């Protein structure tokens, strides 16, 4: 079991009546290509109790029931550990959630989104805990899924960027990607994310820098927020005894200018929520200037500016975007020790394109079969309810 020990970054414990026992909540899943939809589910689950434990499945279990994961289990364990609402991570959690698992970790109940998770033979993985009344449901985040993100990478369009309409080509692909012929269901597929100020408020800490804290500024795309970003931010966080890390996120068009192709894969609003969910980040500047200006440094009272080992592309006028912090002597290059980049993730996906598309079609076929079985069961008279899936 991996325990998170970053104090307020993990969410302060809520004081309650002294006699009240802490409510322990269980979540589990693959958490492959972690995005703000996963983070939002964990945020909602954490709000239902006092202590959140998250079980993460192994590569072997995922391959058996769903298909090949994009990230290794070690990468996925660390990604979940970095989400600020998570108190503990349980590696190698069983794919089917049982009462034995809940009891082993002293959890009162488990929480899952209002979608369906099925085993390789088409059974509900939460069947046992549902029947025992130890299952709670939270609202699934609309507009984001691993299926959608994979589709964006494979189609290579810019339709998902924040200032552009969805093209007819992307809409057609979004409607069909990973779909099994002859039907579709509400759980697998693509929909558009609608950003609201309330969602940002829910993810933000709302905490201002305090006296004695070191304000550290980092900037970039933080696209497909991944373990490489986490390792970098963890190193940055460890540079000060009391760090306050501000992440500046560039506009989509700015990212596309220096990255090219159809980058960023996630638009600015989506990237904002992904970064806000990280326990090492205190604040996000939405649409930060590419060059770190004197105005920005003075406004946020920045003590230190950090950049990783990736190449620094000159600004449009040919200047060094870190010229001002270097002039002030507050620039620091940080080696995260992790070479993973968004480009490498996209390469993993493209290399295994057929496997991922087949995985999504297989997943939806199971979900449709389950839906139909449930529909038939509900249509039968009570005395005949004995449906064998």
Curated annotation (Swiss-Prot):
First-tier enzyme category under EC: transferase
Spans traversing the lipid bilayer: none
Modified residues (Phosphothreonine): 341-342
GO CC annotation terms, alphabetical: cytoplasm
One record GO biological process: phosphatidylethanolamine biosynthetic process
Keywords: Lipid biosynthesis, Lipid metabolism, Nucleotidyltransferase, Phospholipid biosynthesis, Phospholipid metabolism, Phosphoprotein, Transferase
Function: Ethanolamine-phosphate cytidylyltransferase that catalyzes the second step in the synthesis of phosphatidylethanolamine (PE) from ethanolamine via the CDP-ethanolamine pathway. Phosphatidylethanolamine is a dominant inner-leaflet phospholipid in cell membranes, where it plays a role in membrane function by structurally stabilizing membrane-anchored proteins, and participates in important cellular processes such as cell division, cell fusion, blood coagulation, and apoptosis.
Protein family per UniProt: Belongs to the cytidylyltransferase family.
Name by which UniProt lists this protein: Ethanolamine-phosphate cytidylyltransferase
Gene source species: Bos taurus
Lineage: Eukaryota, Metazoa, Chordata, Craniata, Vertebrata
Gene behind this protein: PCYT2
């Amino acid at each position: 079991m991996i325990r998170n020990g970053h104090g307020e970054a993990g969410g302060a414990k809520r004081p309650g009546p002294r006699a009240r026992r802490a409510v322990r909540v269980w979540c589990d899943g693959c958490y492959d290509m972690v995005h703000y939809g996963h983070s939002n589910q964990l945020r909602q689950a954490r709000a239902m109790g006092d202590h959140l434990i998250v079980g993460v499945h192994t590569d072997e279990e995922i391959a058996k029931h769903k298909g090949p994961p994009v990230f290794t289990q070690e990468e996925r364990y660390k990604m979940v550990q970095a989400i600020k609402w998570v108190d503990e991570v349980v590696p190698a959690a069983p794919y089917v959630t049982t009462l034995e698992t809940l009891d082993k970790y002293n959890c009162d109940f488990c929480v899952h989104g209002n979608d369906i998770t099925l085993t390789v033979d088409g059974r509900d993985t939460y069947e046992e805990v549902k029947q025992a009344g130890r299952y709670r449901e939270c609202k699934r985040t609309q507009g984001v899924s691993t299926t959608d993100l994979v589709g964006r990478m494979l189609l290579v369009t810019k339709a998902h960027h924040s200032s552009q309409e969805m093209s007819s080509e992307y809409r057609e692909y979004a409607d069909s990607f990973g779909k099994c012929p002859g039907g579709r269901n509400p759980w697998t597929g693509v929909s558009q994310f609608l950003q609201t100020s309330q969602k940002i408020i829910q993810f933000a800490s709302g905490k201002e820098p305090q006296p004695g804290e070191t304000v550290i500024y980092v900037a970039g795309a933080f696209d497909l927020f991944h373990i490489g970003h986490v390792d970098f931010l963890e190193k940055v966080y460890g540079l000060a005894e009391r760090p306050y890390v501000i992440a500046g996120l560039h506009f989509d068009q700015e990212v596309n200018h220096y990255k090219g192709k159809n980058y960023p894969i996630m638009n600015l609003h989506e990237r904002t929520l992904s970064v806000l969910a990280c326990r090492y980040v205190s604040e996000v500047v939405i649409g930060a200037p590419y060059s770190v200006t004197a105005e920005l440094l003075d406004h946020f009272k920045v003590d230190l500016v950090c950049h990783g080992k990736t190449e620094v592309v000159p600004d449009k006028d040919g200047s060094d975007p870190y010229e001002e912090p270097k002039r002030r002597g507050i620039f620091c290059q940080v080696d995260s020790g992790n070479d993973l980049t968004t480009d490498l993730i996209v390469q993993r996906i493209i290399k295994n394109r057929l496997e991922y598309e087949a995985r999504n079609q297989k997943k939806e076929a199971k979900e449709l079969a389950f839906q139909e079985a449930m529909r038939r069961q509900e249509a039968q008279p009570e005395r005949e309810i004995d449906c064998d899936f």
